[in-house]
Amino acid sequence: MTPDLPIQEAIPALIDALQTRGRAVLQAPPGAGKTTVVPLEMLRAGLTEGRILMLEPRRLAARAAAERMAQSLGEKPGETVGYRVRGEARVGPKTRIEVVTEGILTRMIQTDPELRGVGAVIFDEFHE
């Protein structure tokens, strides 16, 4: 269950935008829940059959985001939500949301430019 955070108010409009236009830009203040609520709500809405990748600029932030989302589902990282950072990965065959760093995403694109199996990419902290 996702916590009751300010971003919850924007989720219906965000899901509608993603369903109708296939892309959206979301801006909200720090602590609103963008990082930990949006990917889970996208998954719940069934917006894609593929995995949801979320790009985090820092390794610590990537691990923390994945751990928080997994915890909110009552799971451990590597189940529904996982992460991949340099030197460490917690993903499994059932992972649907994967938090990655820039280096990991770059390698994924170099290996598979079409990102087969990926249905959505979220750029968190896009300003960085």
Tell me what each language-model feature is.
Residues 2, 8, 16-17, 22-128:
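Conserved P-loop/Walker A NTP-binding site and adjacent catalytic elements of P-loop NTPases
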